[in-house]
Amino acid sequence: STLTATLTDLEDGMEYAYRVVADDFTSAEITFTTPAYPQLPNAGFEEWTTEGGGYAVAYGAGQDKFWDSGNQGAWSLKQNVTTADNTVKHSGTYSAKLESARPNMFGIGKFAAGNIFIGQYLKTDGTDGELGWGRPWTVKPKALKGYIKYKPVAISHIEGKNVPDEYVKGEMDRGIVYIAMLNDELKEYNGTKTWPVIVKTKSQEL
């Protein structure tokens, strides 16, 4: 016969032990450990530093880079589109402020959306970027929660190829949040396989 039981109110990342008792039978002790559900590194965007002479990145001293943005590309025109902000926050001291802009120098520039992503900005190709999206994660999450404040403005620039018809200059822009977990092979980039998704904005290629 099979005996089943449901245990509730267990804590994450804890070891538990149990025995089965029936009449005069007592089983050996059996142990199990509940999964630990780690937080995303720097999930509150409290830690910031600068690289490359001035572009902002969301990690602190001694930490591995988990998040990145298009700041490295925008900084070639001396502007950050993603910065630490202490005026809007849920708790702690900072939030990540994503603000679209069209940095330019001597009349040469390109529209850049404020953005932040898990992965790494890999390379600037002219006025475009190549990005590695994703980081290894070994535990299936039970929830992902966050806090967003979004203030849309009217679209001021239409640039690039294959722009969807619903994006019209003068109409209100829309913010986008993408969340994906992949069980996928790593793509090759410069002879190594590190990222599950490679984005090349010049060719709009995934």
List each model region and its residues.
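Short S/T/G- and acidic-enriched coil/turn segments that sit immediately N-terminal to beta-strands
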Residues: 2-6
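Surface-exposed, short loops/turns at beta-strand junctions within beta-sandwich domains
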Residues: 7-14
